[in-house]
A protein has these predicted regions:
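Basic/polar N-terminal segments that are highly enriched at the extreme N-terminus
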Residues: 1-4, 243
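Non-heme Fe(II) oxygenase catalytic core, chiefly the N-lobe of the double-stranded beta-helix
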Residues: 3-12, 21-175, 192-197, 204-218
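Selective for proline/serine-rich intrinsically disordered segments
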Residues: 16, 42-43, 141, 226, ...
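Short His-Asn-centered micro-motif
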Residues: 18, 182-183
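Non-heme Fe(II)/2-oxoglutarate
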Residues: 67, 178, 185-243
Length: 243
């Protein structure tokens, strides 16, 4: 992780890495993911659901791991992947539902800086498989809210949460880009405003081996068929101190 990205992530709570995937990689993953969504019965059981199929190659993508090792834990054995889902939205579809933000003792939403490094809690990794126009439906953030002293997570302020408050920012990026953010930063989905193409984004939640936020729902048939280097991301939660 570059010093630039490290500082921006700490300052804003998120970073954007444009055009990480090649055009060929984008098309393969997008076509297969839409097939999972629209015609899963045409696939073998272990490829019908994420993270099965070609997407599995992105689980430990170097650009993802370069960040996670700097913001979750420097030991890759202590990083888990606990949730993966597809966000598919046509023109006008979406919602505005701000959440998170402010300091907390909940380890999934806590953001800390200690002894010269970031501990970001749960981290979302978003693969944008179509172009995103700025302020036209990408995920929105209140930058810096992951370190806010006022607890807007449990005590939200309507004038702050309003989309037109002037406090929210989003991003524009080409297809194949990567968005990485701390779950601690206040964020929201938005309404998709691109009539030329839908939003096709894959959201991943990475966490520390010590904690879990999501109820486990991965299909065993999918995980069992992953390569060993990817299966290790789906171990149960435990404290590895005495390994």
């Amino acid at each position: 992780m570059s010093e630039h990205d490290r500082v921006v992530f700490d300052l804003k709570g998120y970073i954007v890495k444009p055009a990480v995937l090649s055009k060929n990689e984008i098309e393969i993953i997008k076509e297969f993911t839409l097939r999972q969504k629209n015609n899963p019965e045409s696939l073998p059981p272990h490829e019908r659901y994420l993270p099965g199929g070609p997407f599995a190659q992105l689980i430990a993508h170097r650009e993802v791991m370069n960040v996670l090792l700097n913001v979750i834990d420097p030991d890759p054995e202590k990083i888990r992947l606990e949730n993966v889902f597809l966000s598919h939205r046509q023109q006008g579809e979406g919602e505005w539902k701000p959440h998170a933000g402010g300091r907390t003792t909940n380890p999934n939403y806590a953001y800390n800086f200690h002894d010269g490094r970031i501990y970001a809690g749960m981290v979302r990794v978003v693969w944008e498989l179509n172009e995103v126009l700025e302020n036209k439906g990408g995920t929105c953030f209140i930058p810096g809210s992951h370190k806010a002293n006022y607890n807007i997570r449990t005590n939200p302020v309507k004038s702050i949460d309003a989309r037109n408050s002037g406090l929210w920012e989003s991003y524009g990026c080409p297809a194949g880009s990567l968005i990485i953010f701390s779950e601690a930063v206040r964020h929201s989905a938005d309404f998709w405003q691109n009539s030329q193409s839908p939003r096709i984004a894959i959201f991943c939640a990475y966490n520390h081996i010590n904690v879990r936020h999501h109820k486990p729902d991965f299909k065993p048939a999918v995980i069992e068929q992953l390569a060993p280097k990817h299966q290790r991301f789906f171990r149960d939660v435990y404290h590895p101190q005495f390994d």
